[in-house]
């Protein structure tokens, strides 16, 4: 992948920083934070490919470009060892039983490619982003009309029949199903369930915008109903950031019917009000680990554990950890920076930290007034990135 190529270029002696990718807003933000931005780079579109380098001199730059060429050729050589169908049509000719397509193409092509798959009665996991809200709604309405899954756009994690897709991990099969509108949250949740000795049937992603008012939870409801109908799924976890009000009522009503008559449902609206699911008689979770513990207990027919509201560690062990870590710091250090590989993990950590520390500044803050553009260089206090 392009991330791996960026990592390899950084290993070239004399390369201070390297970034290879498409011109998405996220990648351009990374370029700004890492000091690689330029007027030329800021002018590109999400469909443009770019290479940004910070090298000590021209000789290092030449070596880095040579390494880039080698990495790109290496990728092509590895592909030549196996057959990779160039189109969906040719893939279906090679294997007519295909019923799921994982799509990762530039955003301007994503709608057409996903629509083509749905036309052919193939479920879709759309990894691509930069798809308009209007196109997303059209795709999902079409998928629902054909009783197909349209996971995404910007769906980064799913596990289907034990097969991890995109950023998912290999985990054990088990009795728990996940309906998730958060990729990193779903990924972390599956790992926690696995570590607790259980496993999952399916982890179905929807894309982060599905529960917004404009989309109306079209795919969340589709995935939820699929898990309700699945006889191997004994417990369901609903995971998302707080949905739009009317969408929350609709999906919670479906969950209540399931919880009352079919199978238990655990709800984790990250950063939301845990009392809302309780009003529907559902099991509310306060964080990802709390959701995992409660789902595993319910799957075993055990009592639901007490709410996990704080760090679950013996006091003496926690104090020893604090002493060990603070001993590594200089006396002048007083603010910390939290670095997270996913927005959900940052949100959850901020929610837990704000209650004890007050303001947490971030590039994705829980409160608008705590917004900072460049948390790597800001000197205004505690920050999560």
Feature-to-residue mapping (PLM):
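Catalytic-core regions of core metabolic enzymes
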Residues: 1-382
């Amino acid at each position: 992948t392009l991330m791996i190529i960026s990592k390899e270029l950084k290993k070239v002696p004399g390369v201070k920083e390297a970034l290879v990718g498409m011109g998405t807003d996220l990648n351009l933000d990374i370029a700004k934070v890492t000091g690689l931005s330029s007027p030329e780079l800021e002018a590109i579109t999400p469909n443009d490919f770019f290479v940004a380098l910070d090298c000590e001199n021209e000789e290092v730059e030449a070596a880095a470009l040579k390494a880039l060429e080698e990495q790109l050729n290496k990728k092509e050589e590895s592909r030549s060892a196996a057959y990779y169908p160039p189109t969906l049509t040719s893939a279906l000719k090679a294997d007519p039983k295909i019923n799921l397509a994982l799509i990762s193409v530039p955003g301007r092509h994503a709608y057409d490619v996903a629509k083509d798959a749905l036309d052919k009665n193939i479920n879709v996991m759309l990894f691509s982003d930069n798809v308009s809200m209007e196109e997303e709604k059209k795709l999902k309405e079409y998928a629902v009309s054909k009783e197909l899954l349209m996971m995404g756009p910007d769906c980064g994690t799913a596990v289907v029949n034990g097969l991890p897709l995109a950023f998912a991990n290999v985990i054990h099969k088990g009795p728990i199903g996940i309906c998730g509108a958060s990729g990193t949250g779903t990924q972390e949740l599956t790992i926690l369930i696995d570590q607790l000795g259980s496993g999952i049937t399916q982890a179905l992603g929807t894309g982060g915008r599905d529960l917004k008012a404009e989309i109306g939870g079209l795919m969340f409801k589709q995935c939820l109903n699929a898990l309700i109908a699945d006889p191997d799924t004994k417990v369901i976890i609903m995971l998302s950031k707080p949905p739009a009000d009317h969408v929350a009522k609709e999906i919670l009503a479906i969950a209540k019917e399931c919880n009352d008559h079919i199978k238990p449902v655990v709800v984790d609206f990250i950063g939301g009000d845990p009392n809302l699911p309780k009003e529907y008689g559902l099991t509310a979770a306060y964080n990802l680990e709390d959701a995992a513990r409660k789902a595993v207990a319910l799957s075993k027919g055990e009592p639901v554990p007490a709410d996990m509201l704080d760090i679950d560690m013996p006091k003496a062990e926690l104090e020893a950890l604090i002493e060990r870590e603070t001993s590594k710091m200089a006396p002048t250090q007083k603010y910390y920076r939290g670095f997270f590989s996913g927005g959900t993990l940052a949100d959850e950590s901020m929610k837990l930290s704000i209650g004890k520390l007050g303001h947490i500044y971030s590039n994705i803050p829980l409160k608008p007034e705590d917004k900072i553009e460049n948390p790597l260089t800001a000197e205004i206090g505690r920050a999560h990135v």
